[in-house]
Design a protein with these regions (language model features):
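Short, structured surface patches at the beginning of a domain
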Residues: 1-159
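Short, intrinsically disordered, charge-balanced linker/junction segments flanking boundaries
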Residues: 163-165
Length: 165
């Protein structure tokens, strides 16, 4: 009987892929090192009884999903559907900084049987009201990028007026 309980638990164990992304600025400014992200994600899986199938490390901007490791991951998922139950990342800004692209990618992953989840901003997307929180989590990084771009433009104009650029 003891073995059947263990086997049942094994059958229900969820499988996760871990997605760890940094851009050089974020890693330096906000402490989002790949090592710290991996530690948090591994601990989350351990606490929640999830097995880790794959760890994906990315060192590219999240403005688009045109990232080398992410593209490789999608090719693999399409070839071998449903190898994992979840793709986990620390926060939604690790996943994407473009709300429109993020919604499309979330839908694509869910069609492949994979649930994307930010462990520090968890949402049960089967609950309709959580769509509002998802909208906020996805829009905030995009707004931050847009603000940063405007600040750079204003800084360049000011520098040009002052003869420094």
């Amino acid at each position: 009987m003891k073995h059947s309980v263990t086997f049942t638990k094994f059958l229900s164990m969820k499988i996760a892929d871990l997605y760890i992304r940094v851009s050089t600025d974020e890693q330096a400014d906000k402490g989002y090192s790949q090592r710290s992200q991996e530690e948090f994600l591994r601990k989350y899986c351990e606490i929640n009884g999830m097995s880790i199938r794959k760890v994906i490390f990315e060192d590219h901007s999240a403005k688009t999903f045109n990232r080398p490791e992410w593209k490789r991951y999608l090719v693999e998922l399409r070839k071998h559907k449903c190898q994992a139950d979840f793709v986990l990342f620390l926060k939604w800004d690790r996943f994407s900084r473009n709300a429109g692209d993020a919604y499309q990618m979330i839908n694509m992953l869910r069609k492949l049987g994979i649930e994307p989840q930010a462990i520090e901003q968890p949402l049960d997307l089967s609950i309709p009201e959580n769509k509002m929180m998802l909208a906020f989590y996805l829009a905030a990084p995009e707004v931050e990028n847009d603000r940063r771009a405007l600040n750079v433009i204003h800084g360049m104009r000011r520098a040009r007026k002052e003869g420094r650029y």
